[in-house]
Amino acid sequence: MATILTDKKAVVLKLKEPSRVTTVIPTAKIVKHNGATLVAVPHRPDETRVLRQLGFKDIPDPLKTHYKFPLAGGKFDPFEAQVETANFFSMNNRCFCTNSMGLGKTVSALYAFDYMKKSKLINKALVICPLSTMERTWADEIFKTFPHLDSAIVYGSRSRRLKMLKEDVDIYIVNTDGIKVIQEALSDRHDINLVIVDEVAMFRNTNERWKSLNEILNKQKPTRRVWALTGAPCPNEPTDAWAQCRVITPASKEVPKYFSQFRDTVMKQISQFKWIAKKDAMDIVHRTMQPSIRYALDDCVDLPPQIIINRDAELTPEQVKAYRDMMSKLSMEYAGGQVLAVNEAVKANKLIQIACGVAYGSNGEEIVLPNKPRIDVLTELVEESEGKVLVFVPLTAVLTNVADELSKKWSVRTVHGGTSKTERDEIFSGFQSDHEPHIIVANPGTMSHGLTLTKGTTIVWYAPIYSNDIYEQACARVRRPGQTKTTVIAHIAASEVERNIYKRLATKQKMQGLLLDLMKEGEIH
């Protein structure tokens, strides 16, 4: 029988043979109490795992016993799914978390890190994540929920990345494509003993990016703890799981050494170049991708009806140039008193157009700018979503391009001012009743009051709109009677103007004065 001393954070055992524990747990100590010989073991995850293997099944989870969870975002108690996920991370050195988008995989991993650091089992962490989540997701969550932790964004030129990696902080955040630059420098960083791989499905192919991660996780310091996060482990085929498992849990007996072995297990060849998934493919993926934890939105009864998430997109060089040119023009107009409350929405919209891939020449001609990073972020969000998706694109000039890109992988229909009522009715009926379309790409102004699209569980705003009423009505399309699931509202932004518009939309603040305030404060960029 084990006794937990919460003030000492220790497990006390009365054993006939203390050596049974002391020989396998170096931190265990023999103590005398009232003439009895007892064994005291630190009540931490590593020791608890060994004790359970020895047969002491009644040892409670250390994190849930001792950790005082900070308020998420400084405001909210963690959901049950977040507590259980954090606890799961703490009890597994290498594992997967495939919780649905919006359930707080980020904060769960940070809760576990915070606890493990306080327990002196982890020193520093490296977070590898998409560029879109570096600042708006990871850095923001650390700042709001864990103000006692320091972080560094390892991004920029090679010299800047290496400089940031030398900073004495608790958590280093690097984008997925930046790990090769710091790969060699990490070989000497034994203090970084946890790696969190966010959106691990981006490593579903054994390319150069995968090889860099494999070097960091399995060759430099195989004892590093590794927690892998993704809401969609197999966005294309069941075979997507193989490379992820080979890099995260290579020692698992469930993971075949060669891709062809795994492919033959989950896929059936029907012609020389065509394979289809077997009926039990996803069951095999689940068995292979272990240890893992998953909560779906439907599993969580303590969630709010809507969850808002923010994703950053990078501007292409062509967009950066056009954006700077427009900013120079606006700055001169502002200095000359030409930016007024009555025209600021039009001027702000020009910046949003550029961020979405459209500019206009001196004669008013439309110029299409490369915007792949924003499309990539949108694709990531659709892959992570559960159920059907509404994508709102306020700019008609961009809407067709967005739909064309998405239609490469999913069934897509578009709704805009030129869509007839008959066609709209057909699209909405199919969305609600049929398997297709999977995605509706729409101008938000065309989504009328009273329209019900409850088969959709995710709304993605490709860009913000300068109207509280249209934003609120568009978001309400999926929050209607008959909606039984928590819905996710995702905002994509590439500029401070967009982020501030979203902030005001989410809190129902008036839009008037937004651009003027930003220019006055010198924060617009």
Question: What is each residue range found by the language model?
Answer:
Residues 92-112:
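Walker A/P-loop
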Residues 133-157, 248-251:
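Conserved helix-turn-beta segment of the N-terminal RecA-like "Helicase ATP-binding" lobe
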Residues 180-185, 236-238, 398-403, 424-428, ...:
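SF2 helicase motor core recognition
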Residues 122-124, 151, 167, 194, ...:
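Conserved P-loop NTPase motor "coupling/switch" region that bridges the ATPase
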Residues 108, 113-121, 126-129, 303-327, ...:
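Conserved Helicase C-terminal RecA-like lobe
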Residues 466-525:
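A conserved SF2-helicase RecA2
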Residues 62-98:
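Conserved pre-motif I regulatory segment
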Residues 106-108, 121-144, 235-240, 394-396:
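Conserved Walker A/P-loop ATP-binding site and its immediately adjacent core
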